[in-house]
Amino acid sequence: MIQKHAIPILEFDDNPQAVIMPNHEGLDLQLPKKCIYTFLEEEIDRYAQEAGAECVGEFISATKTYPVYVMDYKGEKVCLAQAPVGSAPAAQFMDWLIGYGVEQIISTGTCGVLADIEENAFLVPVRALRDEGTSYHYVAPSRYMEMQIEAISAIEQVLEQLGIPYEEVMTWSTDGFYRETAEKVAYRKEEGCAVVEMECAALAAVAQLRGVVWGQLLFTADSLADLENYDSRDWGSEAFDKALELCLEIVSHM
């Protein structure tokens, strides 16, 4: 039932059925339960080719076609897909993957830091502040999305087994890359946000509505810690390969 509100983004309909469902095309496609869904530029395509993964389908958007790969990892089939940047397209593609069989998903990608955190450090978001729009179409309005314990546990278990240091953080999920004003950044820091990115809250909301498991491993890129001197650094490029390898290990523990 729809909950009406003067502000449209705060209106929510809890009916999981919609006029257009993710699998409305009726494709002959059955994806494995486990999935790596990453924000790693072309790293997924390169890795899929090197690992001999099979391209089993495509997600076609108005501007780009995203290959969907399946590979064997430690005796299990795992789906690999490159996530588009931004809450709306990332949520749409992930919802489509779920519609065709995916149930356990690990994402990875960069984040900007609001605190003094070195580049290429691994972080585990446990809560996301919902300053994007997409999550409000999947979960009733609230200030935060809480991450799923099952996913957090799998991520942290692998990091600890491999001796990789990490921190649990609250992240600020925003649609406004060029609207991270000095006052907003300061406000988010006061509230406890250590990093900023664009998709975490939305993907957590998709997973909650669809009843699947999703978690994210972030690694640090640019820095907004000094409001007077923005530092793009090297966008976390040194961590790309390691992050993908970690995701495969994490999803195998789920």
What are these regions (language model features)?
Residues 1-106, 112-254:
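Accessory terminal and edge-of-domain segments that mediate assembly/interaction
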